[in-house]
């Protein structure tokens, strides 16, 4: 893991997994204001509480939930195996700041849709949006949306998610629901959902 600041509002991170080997994260961030920031590179998609806010070292279980793995690119039903990451550009920020957190947060990104270390296979870009509400310290309520087309056949990939989490001190309570529709190469669509 190599991270640092180029300037007071400009930083970067490069994380490599040497076992594979592959680049896991490689991005640059420009953070001019609390309300408007820009990130460019390869990194975790801003979809779901568990994919965005919980890294394996912080996670309580040995594996991510099946719904997240099957619908967000860990072992996706569309064939992606990307640990919830992709290449793209994202705007993000927060409003109504309190001590250490923003009450309202947003993420909006445009991504390749092919996953980790993979060149784009079509001309379509995938869109990901997330809104987060934190009414009090430790409590987070979030909603996510993902729209994209994958592969050279431009097969549909749509995901929705909603969840809540309380993480303060020794207490962590988290619930999340994710659903999606995936176009299949043989024709038809697969609808999936899970908690």
Q: What does each of the following model-derived ranges do?
A:
Residues 132-195:
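Detector for outer-membrane/organellar transmembrane beta-barrel domains
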């Amino acid at each position: 893991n190599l991270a640092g600041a180029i300037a007071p509002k400009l930083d970067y991170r490069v994380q490599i997994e040497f076992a594979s080997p592959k680049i896991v994260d490689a991005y640059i961030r420009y953070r001019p204001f609390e309300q408007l920031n820009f990130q460019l590179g390869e990194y975790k998609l801003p979809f779901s509480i568990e994919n965005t806010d919980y890294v394996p070292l912080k996670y309580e279980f040995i594996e991510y939930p099946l719904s997240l793995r099957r619908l967000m690119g860990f072992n996706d039903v569309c064939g992606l195996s990307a640990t919830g990451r992709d290449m793209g550009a994202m705007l993000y920020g927060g409003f109504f700041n309190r001590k250490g957190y923003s009450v309202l947060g947003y993420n909006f990104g445009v991504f390749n849709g092919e996953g980790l270390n993979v060149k784009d296979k079509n001309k379509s870009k995938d869109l990901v949006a997330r809104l987060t509400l934190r009414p009090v310290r430790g409590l987070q309520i979030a909603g996510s949306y993902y729209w994209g087309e994958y592969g050279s056949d431009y097969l549909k990939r749509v995901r929705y998610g909603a969840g809540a989490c309380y993480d303060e001190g020794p207490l962590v309570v988290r619930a999340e629901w994710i659903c999606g529709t995936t176009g299949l190469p043989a024709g038809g669509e697969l609808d999936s959902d899970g908690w």
